[in-house]
Amino acid sequence: MAMLLTVNRFTHKAYGRTREFNMNINGLMGTDLYHKVAGVIGTGKIGQAMIRIFHGFRMNVLAYDPYPNSNLDVQYVSLEELLSKADFLSLHCPLTPDTHHIINEKTISIMKDGAYLVNTSRGGLIDTQALINGLLAKKFGGVGLDVYEEEEGLFYEDCSDEIIQDDNLARLTTFPNVLITSHMGFFTVEAMQSIAHETLENAYALENNLTLKNLVE
């Protein structure tokens, strides 16, 4: 949600301006979330949390998931309907053969003009070239990416003194309505403590032939 609000309200640009004592607000106008349509693809734990946050902003929330959760207070619709109605689209699904490039030339064409897209899940959910084409066509109001499908060897590294060989990533950084961060959505003190704790618990369980938590069959 922080990324969506930043992209929508240009907070990062406002901060850069005020650091230089430029208090001009031209070009920083955003849009209200109230009563807008939020679309959530993937309703696992993180998707569910995002739905609750959207409801807090009094948004109309639509969801798509091949395995709907009947206990969740949200309206499930087809992917096509969600894409065609969402003013703000947030991706929260795992990367599988079925979800790879779920955002592509075809699905982008279904989206509303001026829609906002945020991906904090997996980079491979988005066809980067299709995204660039959509940005060039001014399809999006804004795009927030905490993940990128070719992030290996780039994200978590200091490449500030290097020539970036990834033309698509370099192109994405040129768009004024695109915000990219380096896969840091998980990076909080509490999350890192939880990861360490669960890793040690699983190591102990494996050593002692106990049941592993979150075992992937």
Regions found by a protein language model. Name each.
Residues G114, G124-E217:
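Rossmann-like dinucleotide-binding domain for NAD(H)/NADP(H)
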Residues M1-V37, A49-R52:
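Phosphate-binding beta-alpha-beta segment of Rossmann-like dinucleotide-binding domains, i.e.
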Residues S121:
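Active-site beta-alpha turn of Rossmann-fold NAD(P)-dependent dehydrogenases/reductases
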Residues V118:
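Glycine-rich nucleotide-phosphate-binding loops and adjacent flexible coil segments
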Residues M1-R9, G16, S84, L91, ...:
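Generic alpha-helical structural context detector
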Residues M1, I51, N104-I108, L131-I132, ...:
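Short amphipathic alpha-helical segments and helix-helix/interface helices
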Residues N26-D113:
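Rossmann-like dinucleotide/phosphate-binding beta-alpha-beta segment
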